[in-house]
Amino acid sequence: MEKTCSRSVSLAAGFIIMLCYGLLYAWSIYSSPLGEQFGWTSALLGTCFTVILISFCLGGVLGSILTKRLDSRRSVMIGAFMSLVGYGLASTVTAESVWLLFAAFSVSGLACGVVYNATVSTVVMRFPDKKGFASGLLLMGFGASTLVF
């Protein structure tokens, strides 16, 4: 017999996951210090954010495929590992390796899309009677992350 948690626990866990992965939208907070430290222009950093958002969208597609083939737990674990790799790469960026910045945040954006898709689809599926409430609370967590962190 498979052990499952209550739907309210799933909603709370989903909110926390979205709160953590919403840092994607905090780019403007840490792009200025990056530009100052490495001497990069705001146009270059803006292009990097564009790459992040494109990767996020592609990650949503990948997340859909993974969640259908595997389950949501494994999809989130894969996304978490991808985040670890992406932010690990970002920690090694130097002024001369701007390509590494793009690569690192492409992986992080992909990871965010995977986790986003797996989390929203799973939690909303558990709330057939309150889909709007569940998805609204999750998206509130995603948006509130820039405020909290």
Positions of predicted regions on the chain:
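Residue-level signature of mid-helix packing/kink "hotspots" within the transmembrane helices
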Residues: 25, 53-61, 147
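Intracellular juxtamembrane helix-capping segments at the cytosolic ends
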Residues: 34, 114-127, 134-135
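Helix-to-loop junctions at the C-terminal end of transmembrane segments
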Residues: 59-72
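Glycine-rich segments within core transmembrane alpha-helices of 12-TM secondary carriers
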Residues: 128-149
